[in-house]
UniProtKB/Swiss-Prot annotation:
This is [LysW]-aminoadipate/[LysW]-glutamate kinase. The gene is lysZ. One of its GO terms (cellular component) is cytoplasm. The keyword Kinase applies. It comes from Saccharolobus islandicus (strain L.S.2.15 / Lassen #1) (Sulfolobus islandicus). Substrate binds at residues 35-36, 62, 167. The record marks 5, 224 as: Transition state stabilizer.
């Protein structure tokens, strides 16, 4: 079993390549998708101006109000069913779900977050409807995998305390699922060839090397490296960070094109 995570730009620009490639892979697949650019498009169409905040670490992320959460759910559902429809039309036994369904992903809403304001000052604001995954109900995945070959997962989670869906980071969802079911391989596909240092792809890293390198590279990729290291340390065989915009993107990553994080 493998987990594949595709970022929002891959969803927008290279989705058919990914779907066709996954349809030809002879393994069980959990496909976690993003879609931030598409969410932004729909938000603007509905006359809602999207808001982004920057953390003290320099990571820019969507600030999810109650109103925008509704748009997020609609857009992610559209992406999910588009992917699932295409896979089924290619003869694959696929199902599309969110992390809310079956209580697959249980999360805690961020009550307060620290952001950097326009003056460069730290400020504490209300957390909105964004959450952090606290638990993965792996039995949901295991049961569905007895019935289906491919599970397409939208990055939504259930806040049990407040009985509401939450927007969660797609990478976080993919890493959490991978650790919970201890998959063989986690493939992270974005619009870059892998982890770049001085313009060159780093071919291979141990978890320790990944943690060390995370201190020296930009926000976004540093989080991927930290989560990749933690995943390998917790039972995932290997994590591969590669390009989702090339031909055969998943197969290419499985052929170890990109950055491979693995023990030893």
């Amino acid at each position: 079993m493998i987990v594949v995570k595709i970022g929002g730009r891959v969803v927008k620009n290279s989705l058919d390549k990914v779907i066709l490639d996954i349809a030809n892979i002879n393994d069980k697949v959990i496909l976690v998708h993003g879609g931030g650019d598409i969410v932004t498009d729909y938000t603007k169409r509905l006359g809602i101006e999207p808001v982004f905040v920057t953390s003290p670490e320099g990571i820019r992320s969507r600030y999810t109000t109650k109103e925008e959460l509704e748009v997020y759910i609609m857009a992610m559902s559209l992406i999910n069913k588009t992917i699932t429809s295409k896979l089924c039309s290619l003869g694959k036994n696929a199902i599309g779900i969110t992390g809310v369904d079956g209580g697959l992903l249980l999360a805690e809403r961020k009550k307060r977050i620290i952001v950097i304001d326009e003056r460069g000052k730290k400020r504490i604001i209300e957390g909105g409807y964004t959450g952090k995954v606290k638990e993965v109900r792996s039995e949901v995945i295991n049961h569905l995998m007895k019935l289906f070959d491919i599970i397409v997962v939208s990055p939504l989670a259930l806040d049990v305390e407040e009985s509401t869906p939450l927007n969660i980071d797609g990478d976080q969802a993919a890493f959490a699922i991978s650790k919970a079911v201890k998959v063989n391989v986690l493939v992270i596909l974005s619009d870059v060839e892998g982890v770049l240092v001085e313009g060159k792809v780093v071919d291979r890293l141990t978890p320790e090397e990944a943690k060390e390198l995370s201190k020296k590279i930009g926000p976004g990729m540093n989080r991927k490296l930290l989560m990749a290291a933690e995943s390998v340390e917790n039972g995932v065989n290997k994590v591969i960070i590669g390009s989702g915009v090339k031909d055969r993107p998943v197969s290419s990553a499985l052929e170890l094109n990109g950055t491979v994080i693995v023990n030893g």
